[in-house]
Amino acid sequence: MAYIDQKHNTFWDDFAIALRDKIVFLNSTWGEIHASAHRFEDLSALAFDEAEEMIYFSDQTHQNGSIFALRRDDSTPIVVQRTGNDSVEGLAYDPLNRNLFWADMRQQKIFFSSVDTLATELPKVLVDLSGEGGQPDGIAVDICRRQLYWTNGNIKSASVERIGLDGKGRQTIISADIDMPRGIVVDQLSDRIFWVDNKVGIFFAIESARLDGSDRQVVVKGKHQDPKHLAINEDAIYWTDRMDKAVWSYPKPTYSQEVTNVTQAEPELAKPFSKEKAYGIVTRTGFYQRLQKDAHCASIVKKVKQQLNTRLNNRTHIRSAEGDRISQLEREHCLNGASFMSRGEFCICPVGFKGARCEISECHNYCVHGTCEISDAGFPKCYCQAEFYGERCEYHKCNGHCLNSGHCSMDKESDAMRCECRPNFGGERCEHNLTEQCAIYCQHPETQLPVSCLDFCEEWSNSNDTATITEYQTAGQCGPAPPVQGPLIIVIVLGLVTTSGLVALTVHGVRLIYKPKRPRIKKTFVVRKQARLNSSSDTPLTNRPLTTEQCEITIENCCNMNICETPCFDPKLVEQTFSSRDRKAPCVKEDKKILIHSMEDNLLS
């Protein structure tokens, strides 16, 4: 049900925090503007409609209702029917269909209803978790892709799930390594979800994933907190902590398709509340200005604007000349082509402008040293001058380049950086302390001194006081060291020679092991005297010699690969040679003539 109440002429700026018994509105610097809903006792969840500047909230124990609305152009409280015996833990709003969704942990269901028919129709059930023991806690609407996300806080089956706003396509996207998830939010700018997980014990975590549950990352991990709900805008993540009675903030990680860069920082205490616990939180995201050209959101933003204009035009009332003049003034109130919403009395700015009247350009004072343009996504983008860099061109390239108070300058043509060093410093970045380096040379008189150190060493030897040498910052590099000495060279040479010898022995041993053996030739020749001539029919088979007339010669390795270990002689030529030697002196050179030239051929013949 809804309860509408507003008595203030100024609405909240950037944040709204639900404490136990009131809603506090704060500006961008966390300064308190005012507080509302003082007649409530047990506030919990919040939801915000940026199209009509409407904030929705829930009270667990109010006697007249469970869900309420806060709008500034209504001053009379309106009470509608109570939703039932419920315990609303999470709220979410869809501006396209003007439906309000809430998670009822007591009934274990997720309900929804149109804000236009809350007083006349009963809410409908979108998801029923009672049969499976689920405990819906935080919920969030993906306006552009028409999905509803929720956290199941049952520690036995904890999960993060989603379903279409039409009730179809339920899907569990996170179910592993999750303990007790609480609040959840959809960031339309980065197309990711963020949720709080109360870990077992004293720990907690804030995690993130893509809309389908992939690319899961831990953004913040800490302890000794009791986080409940969270909100997100362009710059940071914010969550309520019931233990410390405060709101914490953390820099929003930047994601892209190529690079994921998670900012490494510590959570900051954004807003402490000394007496009351903080529960729900919502923040202004600039949805309608930021996403007018987004591929997924542009059509939704256009439809929401058209519906707002249609509802305003359908109002029938008598207009006088004074009324027409007031209407003209209202239209002129918004600058730079912005649209004026009379019901909420606010402006919807076009891409590239912001402010209450859309009077401030997004590029105003945005780029420090460069030119600014509005990107297709509706964000300011800087084109830096040659000497500067950074998201806003706020950093000079020479920052921190020259060390030890050196002066940095840049070449306009090549953009190269050069350093002019102070006396007694040198190097490309003035990283070398010549005083320290010369002191090292001075302590080793056997080394050759650089010319630049002669004067210093002479003065140093006279004073003989090394305590006056000051230590300066360096770039992580050492100065030139004294040259190596003779004994070190000898040791190095001996080591190289020994290593070479060991390598040679190893190679030779391997060759001996794996080299195939050469074949060995073993032949036997029978040598006998000349056959007897007593018979013309005598043959070697019929006229065998006596044992005293023959001998056997075994020849091994004869002419093996041209290496003759045992000389091989032709038996047919031996007798002729010996008979001729008897007539003249023996000649050693003639022995070569009777060597066997082709042993195998002679044997075959």
UniProtKB/Swiss-Prot annotation:
Sugar attachment sites: 27, 64, 85, 261, 314, 433, 464
Record bears the keyword Transmembrane: yes
GO BP term (any one): oogenesis
Molecular function terms from GO: Wnt receptor activity; Wnt-protein binding
Recorded GO CC terms: plasma membrane
SMART domains the record matches: EGF, LY
Ranges: LDL-receptor class B repeats: 53-97, 98-145, 146-190, 191-236
Entry's family note: Belongs to the cueball family.
Protein name in the entry: Protein cueball
